[in-house]
Structures are given as C-alpha cells and as structure tokens.
A protein has these predicted regions:
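Selective hydrophobic functional segments
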Residues: 48-97, 180-223
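Hydrophobic residues within alpha-helical transmembrane segments
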Residues: 12, 16, 51-58, 75, ...
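Structural signature of hydrophobic alpha-helical transmembrane segments
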Residues: 6-7, 37-54, 98-108, 137-147, ...
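Transmembrane helix exit motif
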Residues: 57-67, 89, 103-127, 215-216, ...
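Hydrophobic alpha-helical transmembrane segments in multi-pass integral membrane proteins
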Residues: 45, 87-88, 141-148, 182, ...
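Selected transmembrane alpha-helices and immediately adjacent juxtamembrane segments
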Residues: 1-39, 122-171
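Juxtamembrane helix-boundary/capping and inter-helix hinge elements in multi-pass membrane proteins
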Residues: 39-42, 64-70, 158-166, 189-193
Length: 249
C-alpha cells in the first residue's frame, strides 16, 4: 500500500470515528481500531489510536461532577483493567497477529450483537467486590491483546446499574486509563515507534474535526436510530475482520 493511500485511510478513519463520537459521545477507539485493523494491521491500529483516543476522552472524563463517586465505587475494576494490559500485550508479541485480529473481530461482533439485542447483565452490589476486579483483569488482558476496551468492561459498567451520565463518565474513565496502560505496554514491548507516535499525534486533528461535525449532526439526527446503524456497522466490520484475517492464515 502506497503512502498517499495510507494517509487517506488514516485521516478518513479518524474523521469518521470522531464524527461518531461527536454524535453519540462514544465510539472513537472502537471505530478507528476496527477500520485501521481491516485496512492496515492490528499493531499499527493499536498505536495510532492512542493519542486521539486519550485527547478526546480526557476532558469528557473530568466533567460531570461524578468523578469521586465513580472512582470510589469502581476503583478495583479500573485498576485491574489498567495494570493487566501489559500481560495481554506480551501475548501480542509472541502470537500471530492474524489470530489476534480474528479475536478483535469476534469482540466487535459480540459487542455489537449484544447491544442490538438489548442484552444487559445485572450485577448486584454484593457481587461487585469480586466481579469488578475479575472482569477488569479480563478486560485489561483483552485490551493488551487486541486494543479493544469494550468487552467485557462496558458490559460490566452497564450491569452494575449506573445512571446514564455516570455510566458515560465511567466508560470514558475506563477508556482513558486503558489508553495510558496500552501506551506503556506497547512501549515496553518496543511496538510504539517514534514514527507511529508522530502519526498518532497528527491524527488528533481529523478526530477533533470529526467530533465538531458530529456534534452539529447530532442536533438533527435521532440518536436511537444512529446507535442502531452504528452497531450494525460495527457488527459488519467485525465479521469482515474475521473473514479477512481467517483467509490470510
């Protein structure tokens, strides 16, 4: 693939991902990771999403006035989801990336299918003490292996019954901490090169432009309908990644 086409793909991926985040408040890491894995490769996609994901999440994580409540309730989950990323990234260095791309596709497929079906787990407060650290650790390992932050982490945050505003802020906290953990893990395994880090920094620009556009579109679009389109698209993207990687084995 020539450099011009690669640049166009990267800009397009982050413009689209930023637009989706502007419309529904979430989705930049998931969309950019899926698109770049489908067109480039998994490791490159994981590195490129780091800075745009962090920059677009950090402000969202600190507003809303619920930070102390959220941290007090889910800090064991957040800690394990962050510190176990290095373990998953170690697997990334010794495993055929095509297998991990298939795993990523499967995670995206499952995540979108469950949301389309309206499936929700329910975890009572008395079970949060053990389920939070357990699912946090699983989420961290899968993040290190695939770059995806959403399964089972987002499902856990939905399952403990957080109100919408607190749920969104908790998810953004998870994504922000996971981005930091992933950056350190990739650097430790010599996968975070200066060249890719520079490109990731430049990718902030189309991400922010996309967010601004998405926020304007949001005013004239049904969020419910868009979410359905979003999850159907992620489902198709996950299936495509599975098929493409499977055929390449």
């Amino acid at each position: 693939m020539n450099e011009t086409l690669t640049v166009i793909i990267i800009i397009g991926a982050f413009l689209l991902a930023g637009s989706i985040k502007g419309i529904i408040g979430l989705g930049l890491p998931t969309v950019s990771l899926g698109l770049l894995t489908a067109t480039l490769d998994l490791t490159t996609a994981m590195v490129l999403l780091l800075i745009p994901s962090f920059i677009t999440n950090i402000w969202q994580a600190t507003v809303g006035g619920n930070g102390k409540f959220i941290i007090k309730r889910i800090w064991p989950f957040l800690c394990l989801a962050t510190v176990t990323i290095w373990l998953g990234s170690t697997v990334l260095t010794i495993t055929n990336p095509l297998y991990l791309s298939i795993l990523l596709g499967a995670l995206l497929f499952v995540y979108s299918t469950l949301n389309l079906l309206g499936f929700r787990l329910s975890i009572s407060p008395k079970h949060e003490k053990w389920s939070g650290p357990l699912l946090g650790a699983v989420n961290g390992i899968l993040t290190g292996m695939t770059g995806s932050f959403v399964v089972p982490g987002v499902m856990y945050l939905q399952a403990i019954g957080l109100p919408r505003d607190k749920l969104v802020q908790a998810m953004v906290m998870l994504f922000s901490l996971s981005t930091i953990g992933l950056a350190f893990a990739l650097q430790n395994n010599n996968l975070l090169t200066t060249e890719l880090a520079t490109i990731s920094a430049f990718a902030v620009v189309p991400s922010i432009i996309g967010m601004v556009v998405g926020q304007k579109i949001r005013k004239s679009l049904s969020e419910t309908r868009f979410r359905r389109i979003f999850f159907v698209s992620i489902l198709v993207l996950g299936a495509f990644i599975i098929a493409k990687s499977g055929l390449a084995l």
